[in-house]
């Protein structure tokens, strides 16, 4: 298998790999609350400027692309979620939360959940084990 690329793996190989990670029992309830036919989970990654910072590319163009989320998208998203009474989770890299504390306060004030999304959106698959700890 080591000589093959993932797209070249035979079906038993990828089925076995995926099977290792499968959760145990089904979490689907016998009936959803209020007669609903399904459940939906909505979350947002509020990465903002952390991707270009992580990539060591603090060019004004890349930073301004990251700022779009805070300046334009987030107010619209919060307004939509409030109008539709949709609770959600916003995942923030710590650096993004430190750069935009007023946004984090607004998210919390609207009753949404905050989740941590790394320090600066590290590419954790490339980190040495000791750095990841």
What are these regions (language model features)?
Residues 2-133:
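Catalytic alpha-helical scaffold of carbohydrate-active enzymes acting on polysaccharides/glycoconjugates
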């Amino acid at each position: 298998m080591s000589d093959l690329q993932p797209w070249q793996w035979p079906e038993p190989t990828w089925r076995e790999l995926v099977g290792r990670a499968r959760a145990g029992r089904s979490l689907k309830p016998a009936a959803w609350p209020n007669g609903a036919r399904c459940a939906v989970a909505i979350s947002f990654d509020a990465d903002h400027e952390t991707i270009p910072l992580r990539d060591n590319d603090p060019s004004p163009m890349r930073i301004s692309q990251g700022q779009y989320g805070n300046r334009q998208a987030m107010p619209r998203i919060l307004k939509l979620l409030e109008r539709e009474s949709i609770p959600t989770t916003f995942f923030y890299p710590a650096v993004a939360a430190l750069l935009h504390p007023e946004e984090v306060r607004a998210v919390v004030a609207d009753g949404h959940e905050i989740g941590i999304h790394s320090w600066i959106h590290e590419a954790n698959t490339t980190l040495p084990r000791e750095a990841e700890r």
